């Protein structure tokens, strides 16, 4: 895969396995890039990504003000992908959680492989959901899949 305007089925499956961490880049008020890791991410289809975040998070505020977003996905198997698009608040408050969690929807405009011949990606970002957040995480994913 060189570049495209949509996700391949392989990338959709990788994102939707619910163990994938991506890095989301947004634009701060002063024009600087702002990055943050996200685990609550779901590929709704080949042209749409959803992710959820706290309404108090910088990423949320940046998307409300300026919807330009870039998502970086790196995973084992030499996967390195940049996903560019425009994001907006799709749902201000998730019904499945009591915390202030919003769902963001991103319309994908560009997808490209960032694999290099110099080095191979052997692992993505790994994390483990803390026990007290497992139920909330399940609710977030259930809602993002609707």
Give names to the regions the model predicted:
Residues 1-146:
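Binding-site signature for planar aromatic cofactors or substrates
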């Amino acid at each position: 895969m060189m570049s495209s305007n949509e996700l391949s089925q392989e990338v959709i499956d990788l994102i939707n396995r619910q163990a994938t961490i991506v890095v989301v880049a947004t634009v701060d008020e002063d024009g600087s890039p702002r990055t943050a890791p996200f685990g609550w991410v779901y590929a709704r289809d080949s042209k749409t990504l959803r992710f959820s975040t706290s309404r108090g998070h910088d990423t949320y505020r940046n998307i409300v003000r300026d919807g330009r977003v870039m998502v970086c996905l790196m995973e084992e198997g030499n996967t390195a992908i940049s996903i560019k698009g425009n994001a907006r608040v799709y749902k201000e408050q998730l019904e499945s959680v009591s915390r202030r969690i919003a769902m963001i929807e991103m319309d994908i405009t560009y997808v490209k492989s960032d694999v290099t011949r110099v080095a191979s990606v052997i692992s993505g970002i790994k994390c483990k959901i803390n026990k007290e957040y497992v139920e909330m995480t399940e609710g977030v994913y259930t809602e993002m899949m609707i």
